[in-house]
Amino acid sequence: MEEEFILKKYFIQYMKNIKGLSDTSVKHYIGSLRTISKFLRERNLINREVYEVIDIDMLRRLREIVYSDSDFINKNNRGKRMYSAGLNNYIAFAEGEDFKDIRDKSLLMDIPVPVKAVTGKRMISWNRSGIIRNQALEMAEYRCEVETTHESIIAERNHKLYMEGHHVIPMKKQMNFKNSLDVYANIVCLCPTCHRKIHYGVKDDRIKMGEKIYLDRADRLVNSGIRLSKREFLSIILY
């Protein structure tokens, strides 16, 4: 069985649990994106599905290509714009639209996402989704989740506080887990100071930060199929 894309799983969760759409509506959107994926595959722009794209700028460029194609325009018009509606809704999701309003509902987005088992002795590089990272920052409203009073510069890119996404359990530990670590529950929004501190600060400070994060995220990690005791958690993140 092929591994299902994490962004597809999250998009379905988002439509059902956050947007409150019916199973029928969700099925229509997924069907529209299946057609979009076929269009992109036929032009050698993706390998399998649109959900494999982990960079939001690339996703936007693909939308421009799709919407400028005369064959797609005709097909979309015949389908009463159902295909463009599916893609527009997916990109709005990928951009983190409304994510700042779902912080209290974040548990509804957390699901286990199995990763393929890796065999053999070789160097492994685990992909990190820029889309998921940015969504996590949106969910945190661009506020440091360790020290909420910490300020930062205003970023030119989005005119929001500059924050950084930190994988609490490092991606290099992925081989020790059957479920993905590149998930919302494992990404915290940190100001640059706290991000440096959790990597390079004195051990006592890092322990305090780790304890706070564990308190805030333990249940969400469990929902994502990542179950660790406090001792196990701290031993991993303090490496």
Regions found by a protein language model. Name each.
Residues 106-157, 172-182, 237:
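Short, charged surface segments at domain edges that flank catalytic/cofactor-binding sites
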Residues 1-25:
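Short terminal alpha-helical segments
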Residues 160-239:
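A detector for short metal-coordination/catalytic motifs
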Residues 97-106:
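Hydrophobic alpha-helical segments and helix pairs
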Residues 1-7, 157-165:
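A glycine-rich, aromatic-flanked flexible loop/lid motif
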Residues 28, 131, 163-166:
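Append "and, occasionally, other polyanion-binding protein interfaces
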Residues 19-94:
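Non-catalytic DNA-binding core/recognition domains of DNA-processing enzymes
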